[in-house]
């Protein structure tokens, strides 16, 4: 499994809790492919990875066994990893994000070196890139 470094403010996503890259990847997979899961798989996966509930807590909330929760989470993870392997959407998203950040840094350097209209154009381009990055 490839671990992607998703550059986000982790505290914004987690309410201040520390989050591993693996959990961030799982959250991104759910964002990209969650609608392709069954409702039960999506709910169990979301409660486990995004809400940080234990298997017992999820089982109680969903009215199924801990084993059922575990199986739903594993099936969801497997299905989303299979879809990602076939489509590569998350990988391409990350590659585009990295490329946009590099362009933004290049534009920042260019803006520092130039004056006049070229400087204004570089600053405008940086703002547009920031907007694209913020949208995800």
Task: Specify the residue positions occupied by each region the protein language model found.
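Short amphipathic alpha-helical boundary/capping segments
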Residues: 28-37
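Short amphipathic alpha helix immediately N-terminal
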Residues: 39-50
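Helix-turn-helix DNA-binding elements, focusing on the entry/boundary residues of the two helices
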Residues: 55
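Hydrophobic positions on the alpha-helical face of helix-turn-helix-like DNA-binding modules
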Residues: 58-59, 69
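Helix-turn-helix DNA-binding motif, specifically the short coil turn and the N-cap/start of the second
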Residues: 65-66
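Residues within the DNA-recognition helix of helix-turn-helix
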Residues: 72-75
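C-terminal flanking helix
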Residues: 77-84
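Intrinsically disordered, low-complexity basic tails/linkers immediately adjacent to helix-turn-helix/homeobox/MYB/SANT
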Residues: 86-113
């Amino acid at each position: 499994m490839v671990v992607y470094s998703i550059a986000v403010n982790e505290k914004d996503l987690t309410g201040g809790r520390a989050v591993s890259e693996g959990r961030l990847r799982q959250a991104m997979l759910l964002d990209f492919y969650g609608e392709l899961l069954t409702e039960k798989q999506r709910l169990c996966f979301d409660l486990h990875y995004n809400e940080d509930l234990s298997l017992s807590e999820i089982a109680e909330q969903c009215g199924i066994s801990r084993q059922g929760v575990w199986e739903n989470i594993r099936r969801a993870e497997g299905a989303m990893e299979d879809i990602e392997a076939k489509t590569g959407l998350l990988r391409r998203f990350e590659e585009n994000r990295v490329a946009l950040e590099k362009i933004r840094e290049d534009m920042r350097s260019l803006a520092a070196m130039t004056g006049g209209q070229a400087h204004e154009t570089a600053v405008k381009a940086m703002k547009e890139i920031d907007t694209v990055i913020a949208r995800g």
